[in-house]
Amino acid sequence: MIEIRPWGTYEVLLDKPDHKVKEIYLKPNHRFSLQYHEHREEHWVIVEGSGTITQDDGEGTISPGEYAYIPRGTLHRLCGGENGIKLIEVQRGICDEDDIVRIEDDYGRLEK
């Protein structure tokens, strides 16, 4: 089932007790929250489009065929480029959708 979010869509391809695989589409010039996860790590493989990735204090461009590793506790964000970006995300650990600590959010989803 495809889940719709303000930034784009995702579909869970595999959901196991200790890992999850998603296909994610981030709309052009939209971005994830600046966030970190306490209980999981993420691995991103870019399959279409390009974007800007932020990890802790660094920022760079990421394109098809490139890979990013986001360790647990790492502050991160992805922004879709002018054509958006599609990626496969592999989560390892406790893969609960509530394990998101948002620092900044363009869509008003910061917890008060």
Locate the predicted segments by residue:
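Double-stranded beta-helix
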Residues: 1-5, 77-112
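A generic "binding-loop/recognition-motif" signal
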Residues: 30, 39-40, 58, 74, ...
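Short acidic-glycine-tyrosine-enriched beta hairpin
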Residues: 56-75
